[in-house]
């Protein structure tokens, strides 16, 4: 075969591939061809769920870094495995009898993997959240992060318990504690208190030069926090770091350093290194507040969980917290792009699968479900639950969304997604567009600093979800933008607005 013939065959194959992908409309092409995107790579597909056909596409079979659109798969697998009505049950047991109000043994909190254990619940049956992932430096979640633990302490007190001869122990054996989430580096654990961070809120003084003050949430004696922070002039960029005392082996002495401008408080955070130990301490605090005299577990030895489990019977249960349905937890994950919660789900699903087969993990559960649905996973790569290690093709994502839409829980999944220009991570995207309020989709972002050019590079921006056209056509879509490097302010915002604009244009023109 001659080189010219090989070239001709390659050109013909490429032409056939392009012909098989209906090109996007001119208005969308104009967005893609903007000068700032000249080095970037686009991929997308808009797919009619009822006609089961592609409306238009670009690079639909190529793999793209998807960012947090990965959470669509993670959450969908959990919907399919746990069910939308699944409730987490976190229980407190005693290991011995009660004599004169004193437990002759330990009090053991059995972690259930509830991602929202300490999140305040609205009376309407939803969890409180802000439109930004709390773990990424967003403001503290509304309400007292220890309110659920206080309710459990009140239940124990109502049983007449006034103390324990043993210790307060957290059984975190549901799955392995200690792996750090890829995006935030927060520790994954079956016990999640305040998203496994302590909020460090820095309040400036009234005038420049005055010291700033620090408060923490949850309020606990677990930490000693020193402040070396100064108030700067209004408009000065905030610079706050939370440092651990290197001489403190327990990581319980912190110092806040830096500056904050006159005005509103600045939020920082400290990632809890061992959530189960932190949980033992704060649970002991709230039990003592309820009049139950206890101490947290002492020493570094891992408890004998098998021995403790013999006490996990109804007659020894002293308190229980039942979560809202999983569909409410999914709203927090998808609306705010909650990394820790999403990263925990494969561990949780793996722990349930391991009951049936010891060699199962969460990704085995996902693969079996996806392939059982007839989806070709050649267009998908997933190494974590949140999106720090994944690749997807636009065509895989739209077929996945097609499958999800047909499930009994598909409406709950759809309603948990951010809404364009309205809420969640899409609250500020295309707020004045005709499609605002009409597109439900998950965002995704992965960026890093480019020290060579002193700028941010957006490795990935994604948007995938659904809308219904004005004529009633149900559309699933996936849009990806990779390798966006341009000297523009806030490039992730520029990319996010562009993807939102593409979705909005599609809503306008698809009849």
Language model region names:
Residues 28, 52, 71-78, 168, ...:
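Residue-level preference for non-acidic, small/hydrophobic
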Residues 57-77:
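Short active-site loop at a secondary-structure junction
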Residues 21-34, 80-377, 471, 494-497, ...:
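Conserved serine DD-peptidase/penicillin-binding transpeptidase domain
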Residues 7-8, 18:
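Cleavable N-terminal signal peptides
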Residues 55-57, 147, 343-511:
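Small-residue-rich helix-loop
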Residues 33-58, 299:
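A short, well-structured edge-of-sheet supersecondary motif
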């Amino acid at each position: 075969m001659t080189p010219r013939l090989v070239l001709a065959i390659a050109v013909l194959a490429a032409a056939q591939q392009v012909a098989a992908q209906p090109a996007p409309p001119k208005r969308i092409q104009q967005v893609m061809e903007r000068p700032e995107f000249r080095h970037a790579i686009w991929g997308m597909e808009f797919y009619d769920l009822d006609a089961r056909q592609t409306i238009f596409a670009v690079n639909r079979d190529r793999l793209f870094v998807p960012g947090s659109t990965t959470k669509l798969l993670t959450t969908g697998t959990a919907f399919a495995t746990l069910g939308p009505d699944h409730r987490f049950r976190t229980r407190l047991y005693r290991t011995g009898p009660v004599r004169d109000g004193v437990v002759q043994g330990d009090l053991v909190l059995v972690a259930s993997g509830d991602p929202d254990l300490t999140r305040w619940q609205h009376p309407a049956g939803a969890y409180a959240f802000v439109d930004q992932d709390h773990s990424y430096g967003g403001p503290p979640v509304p309400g007292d992060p220890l309110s659920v633990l206080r309710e459990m302490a009140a239940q124990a007190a109502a049983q007449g318990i006034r103390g324990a001869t043993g210790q307060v122990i957290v059984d975190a054996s549901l799955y392995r504690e200690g792996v750090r989430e890829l995006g935030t580096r927060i520790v994954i654990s079956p016990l999640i208190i305040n998203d496994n961070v302590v909020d460090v809120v820095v309040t400036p003084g009234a005038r420049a030069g005055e010291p700033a003050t620090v408060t923490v949430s949850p309020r606990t004696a677990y930490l000693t926090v020193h402040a070396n922070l100064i108030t700067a002039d209004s408009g000065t960029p905030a610079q706050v770091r939370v440092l651990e005392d290197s001489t403190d082996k327990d990581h319980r002495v912190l110092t806040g350093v830096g500056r904050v401008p006159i005005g509103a408080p600045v939020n920082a955070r400290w990632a809890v290194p061992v959530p189960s130990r932190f949980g033992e301490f704060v649970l002991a605090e709230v039990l003592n507040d309820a009049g139950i005299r206890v101490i947290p577990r002492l020493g570094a030895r891992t408890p004998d969980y098998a021995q403790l489990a013999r006490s996990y019977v109804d007659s020894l249960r002293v308190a229980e917290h039942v979560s809202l349905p999983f569909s409410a937890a999914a709203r927090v994950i998808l609306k705010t792009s909650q990394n820790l919660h999403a990263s925990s789900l494969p561990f949780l699903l793996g722990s349930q699968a391991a009951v049936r087969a010891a060699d199962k993990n969460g990704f085995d559960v996902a693969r079996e479900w996806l392939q059982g649905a007839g989806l070709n996973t050649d267009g998908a790569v997933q190494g974590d639950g949140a999106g720090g290690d994944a690749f997807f093709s636009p065509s895989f994502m739209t077929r996945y969304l097609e499958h999800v839409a047909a499930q009994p829980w598909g409406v709950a999944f759809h309603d948990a997604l951010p809404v364009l220009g309205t809420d969640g991570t899409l609250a500020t995207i295309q707020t004045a567009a005709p499609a605002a309020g009409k597109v439900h989709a998950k965002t995704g972002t992965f960026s890093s600093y480019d020290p060579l050019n002193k700028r941010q590079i957006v490795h990935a921006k994604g948007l995938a979800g659904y809308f219904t056209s004005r004529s009633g056509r149900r559309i699933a879509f996936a849009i990806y933008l990779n390798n966006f490097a341009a000297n523009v302010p806030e490039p992730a915002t520029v990319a996010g607005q562009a993807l939102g604009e593409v979705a909005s244009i599609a809503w306008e023109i698809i009849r």
